[in-house]
């Protein structure tokens, strides 16, 4: 994806200062995976793509080098902000309960991205589901509390979703949500990202 180099994302992700904190996080690769998946399956105009990249790059300027970003979630939210602004605003204002959010995400994102049983796109689609899981987990943060998204661990029993996903692979979502439970810096209130995007809008107005 040649266009991404025009925006010089490496100037943020590739700095020596940031590498001291997040060298193992593969931030730019994660960012690219989400961009490629969305642009492959969404019929976006060049203007929309340019706006998504521009807004993402400007939002990154508001993060310090030692501040956690979660670039794949940032990019997905920026896509919603540019292309599906009503959904984005309702996410920002937490107008949905968890089930409502999941329903809206499944309606917005092409179903082919959720398929993890096709070898060609299996890895990329699985990564996308992990990004969705992290977005949902961050949305579920309420102050110092966190809405439960999967059943508690029990001996000899698989954990299950506490919401219904019609199109997303349930097993992969459970794995992804279990993964988020063990990320010491990966779960935060979604406002950590949306405030940066909204602050950018204030500068424009």
Predicted features, each with a name:
Residues 1-3:
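A short helix-turn-beta junction within AAA+ P-loop NTPase domains corresponding to the substrate/partner-engaging
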Residues 7-205:
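The feature marks long, low-complexity, polar/acidic/proline-rich intrinsically disordered regions embedded
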